[in-house]
Amino acid sequence: MKNRGITTLTIVAALLVGGLGSPLTTTLAGSKHHPLNFKSIDDGEILYVPRDYATIQSAVNAAGEGDTILVATGVYSENVVVSTSDVRLRGGGDVVLDGTSLSGIGIHVLGASATAPATGVEVSDFEVRNFERGIIVEWATKARVSDNYVHDNVDKLAPAVLGDGTGIELVTASASDVSDNVVSRNGLGGIQLRVGSTDNTIHHNRVDENGSQSSTFDGVGILVTGAGTDNNQVQHNKIVANFGRGILLSRPPGTVPLSGNLVAHNRAHRNLRAGIAIMFAATGNTVVHNDARENNLSGLPPCFHCNLFDLSIGGNTWDKNLGTFNETDASCLQ
């Protein structure tokens, strides 16, 4: 597809008809037929599914660094693993990845190891549903997950035991961006940052009605947990009607505290437990300018074990919270 001898201008519309994804080229007088699609040709190849490749995974396997995989409108039943750096995986219309007949993960961005991460992978404009986990970014850096609808992913074998049922999850991921997604009705929780995920930004997502299967993690909308999960930003999200807490920062017992995380400008409304919770030795985090309303327990209950001196709390809105601020595992700060 690469052609560096372009001398004239071609205007192209990618016409995806009957799942073929054939490009429709309108050529100005005197110009050569050369589809430009939606980006510079020198950026890499464009691989079309299903026109050029029957499955998304076969296109991923053929892609090199800098390539874009454009998936045409349709319903696809497959698990997708992306391990090549700088690959862009994009839905080109109403693209559904359905796991009704499958188990496991819908889309898994997976590096070789924590020290050899996949870099710069993008996943955008997909509906991912009915898997055990929706989109997982693991051993990766500078990934981008945006404009996806991730819903109804549940633990199919042993609810609340195996840890399945998350919508979007970052595991040992760094400097990545999760934005403008809708994450709904996933069995365990909505968005999770775990196990040494650092310097990530989670922003402008809607996270609602997650956690109907959960007991261990209490159906958290956005969970920040695990040793070394530090210096992340959770901002401008709307977290509504989850079965547990809206936002939770908590480290497992016996591990180093979470620190340096920023939780700001979020709206946590009508969650069945606290709107925002800081628990189990999460220290030195900043929680400012959030709006927590109509949650069934206190808007923000720091745990007895937290280092409150290092915890900066201010500018939050707390009203219309139900209950008497008497969670068994937390005290209330107003």
Go through the PLM ranges and name each one.
Residues 45, 67, 78, 85-87, ...:
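The right-handed parallel beta-helix/beta-solenoid scaffold, focusing on the short coil/turn
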Residues 64, 84-85, 92, 102, ...:
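Parallel beta-helix/beta-solenoid
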Residues 70, 81, 88-90, 98, ...:
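Extracellular beta-strand solenoid repeats
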Residues 284-334:
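Leucine-rich solenoid repeat scaffolds
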